[in-house]
Design a protein with these regions (language model features):
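N-terminal edge beta-strand
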Residues: 11-28
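Structural beta-strand segments of beta-rich domains
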Residues: 29-35
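N-terminal, post-signal-peptide region of Sec/Tat-exported proteins
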Residues: 35-68
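Short, aromatic-rich amphipathic segments at membrane interfaces
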Residues: 187-220
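Juxtamembrane interface at the cytosolic side of transmembrane helices
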Residues: 214-244
Length: 244
């Protein structure tokens, strides 16, 4: 089930994340998250959805003895969100200063500076591995940066905005933060937040509890359920943040 919360930052800007209840159950394949609210008609908008920051790892592949491709090392990422979505009225670089982007970690360039990578020998190597990490995340539909995808309507003398995000099944349970920024003259002048809490339900929740408390029983039930359903239940439980 997805629980929704909204916070109004001021009388001008509001943010509400709103969609049907989502249960991560046995047949869950993702959903949609819409974000809407009221905004200043003279301001550009940036909408960001992120998970809490965490540690993630990306495995390095290389040839061993000049013959076989194998894992030859691991790049560790610190302070990185498992999910990062960004939507804006225009390209972020065109409407927000570098300092403002860095302060609120808006955009891939700011995220790259914010994230710590180990081991890397210099900024050039960091940029290469961060780029590979973003490609992996985008392929998994966990990272997305897009512009021009916010629509506006006028009602009762107010400007209403709306955008829609495809919510990937790979996103793990937890609390996600939706932040809406109002931007003028390349500075953030207002912001509003919503929280989206995603939870497991039904058999998935029970099996997840078994996986934690009784791995042997979980393994047997997972195989039986997979044979009955035609796909591996284990796929449902894989963490969206893990990179292989």
């Amino acid at each position: 089930m997805t629980m929704l919360f909204s916070v109004q930052a001021s009388a001008e800007l509001t943010a509400i994340a709103n969609h049907d209840h989502i249960s991560i159950d046995f047949f869950y394949h993702g959903s949609n998250v819409s974000v809407r609210g009221v905004s200043d008609p003279d301001a550009d908008l940036i909408i960001k959805i992120t998970s809490p920051e965490e540690h993630q790892a990306l495995r390095q592949k290389g040839k061993v003895a000049g013959l076989l491709w194998m894992n030859v090392g691991t790049i560790n990422f610190e302070h990185v969100p498992s999910l990062y979505f960004l939507a804006s009225t225009k390209k972020v670089d065109d409407i927000l200063s570098k300092d403002e982007m860095a302060k609120d970690v808006v955009g891939y360039e700011a995220l790259e500076k914010h994230v710590e990578l180990k081991p890397v020998k210099d900024e050039e190597e960091k940029a290469i591995w961060f780029g590979e990490f973003v490609k992996y995340k985008e392929h998994s539909k966990l990272y997305s940066v897009a512009s021009g995808n916010i629509t506006f309507t006028r009602q009762d003398g107010k400007q209403n905005y709306y955008t829609l995000f495809e919510w990937p099944y790979q996103a793990i349970p937890g609390v996600y933060t939706v932040t809406v920024y109002a931007v003028k003259n390349k500075k953030i002048v207002e912001q509003a937040e919503s929280k989206v809490q995603v939870e497991q339900a039904g058999i998935v929740k029970r099996l997840a509890g078994m996986a934690k408390n009784n791995a042997a029983v979980y393994g047997i039930l997972s195989i039986m359920a997979a044979l009955g359903a035609g796909f591996g239940v284990g796929l449902i439980f894989r963490k969206g943040g893990g990179a292989h």
